[in-house]
């Protein structure tokens, strides 16, 4: 059975903790009755309640004591409510804390704006030293969790709610800097996918158009700088698909890193959901759906696209 990103994280961390006694798990009122880590390692599981900032601060102390803490809470509460703690803990102290943030984007759907998070990449990408990942599918999530557990570096891992996705093929156990899921004519447009829904839409658009598709997992400045160089060696026109605000997202970062290339964005824009609905309905209301991606590819092919201004806000 294919697991969601959140469930794959919990399962992989539980497995790793059986061999590494320094791994500990903290949740902010999200553990539930059947958390696999709590069942397998009850003395290393802490449910701290609705106290996200305090949870991150606790994790910093555990890291200073030689442990490898993984903390998890909804993305809006991790990246926004606890932003100060993330800045001081992951940034200033460079503590080896991994934050796993489900409910990213608008995967919270009918829970509404309080449970949506379209700004987390902008916040975390501005904190130096934090490794940022947005895995797609179970295999990538497991690989990212394993890497974070080994590294001892601060991480922010972005995932959705309960949706499952078929993993992209991986050659080996390590994630490539750029996963070229499909490579076409270098003179044509290249889709660049970010996160779960950005990748789902890009896969569908690639199947419909035959353009190249490059998938990114690691989104911090260090990784994106290297990825941008690889992208530019193969293509010069990119449509970036991401479930994030235009400001501070990956498209804007790539536009700055690739000034000689054409970069346009298909994202969540600058609006707020005004009606309820499921995940995909809320995305569509914000302008993020397959027709929007296909339109962006078509416009770029015909020279009618609106590029992301390097040094300015994405449109």
Task: Indicate where each model-derived feature is located.
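Thiamine diphosphate
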Residues: 1-145, 149-156, 160-315, ...
């Amino acid at each position: 059975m294919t697991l969601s990103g959140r469930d794959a994280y919990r399962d992989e961390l539980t497995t790793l903790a059986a061999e590494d006694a320094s791994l500990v798990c903290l949740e902010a009122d999200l553990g539930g009755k059947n958390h696999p880590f709590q069942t397998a390692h009850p003395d290393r599981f802490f449910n701290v309640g609705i106290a996200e900032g305090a949870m991150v601060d606790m994790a910093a102390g555990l890291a200073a004591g030689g442990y490898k803490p993984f903390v998890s809470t909804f993305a809006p509460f991790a990246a926004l409510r606890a932003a100060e703690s993330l800045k001081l803990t992951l940034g200033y102290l460079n503590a080896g804390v991994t934050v796993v943030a489900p409910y990213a984007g608008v995967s919270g759907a009918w829970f509404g704006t309080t449970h949506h998070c379209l700004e987390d990449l902008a916040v975390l990408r501005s904190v130096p030293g934090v490794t940022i990942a947005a895995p797609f599918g179970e295999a990538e999530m497991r690989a990212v969790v394993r890497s974070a557990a080994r590294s001892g570096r601060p991480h922010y891992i972005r995932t959705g709610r309960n949706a499952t996705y078929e993993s992209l093929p991986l050659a080996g156990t390590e994630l490539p800097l750029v996963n070229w899921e499909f490579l076409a004519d270098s003179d044509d447009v290249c889709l660049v996918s970010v996160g779960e829904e950005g990748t789902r839409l890009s896969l569908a658009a690639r199947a419909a158009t035959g353009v190249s598709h490059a998938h990114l997992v690691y989104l911090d400045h260090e990784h994106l700088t290297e990825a941008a160089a690889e992208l530019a060696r193969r293509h010069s026109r990119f449509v970036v698909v991401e479930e994030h605000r235009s400001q501070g997202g990956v498209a804007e970062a790539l536009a700055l890193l690739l000034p000689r290339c054409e970069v346009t964005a298909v994202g969540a824009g600058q609006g707020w959901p005004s009606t309820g609905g499921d995940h995909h309905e809320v995305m569509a209301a914000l302008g993020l759906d397959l027709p929007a991606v296909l339109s962006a590819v078509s416009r770029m092919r015909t020279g009618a696209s609106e590029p992301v201004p390097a040094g300015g806000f994405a449109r």
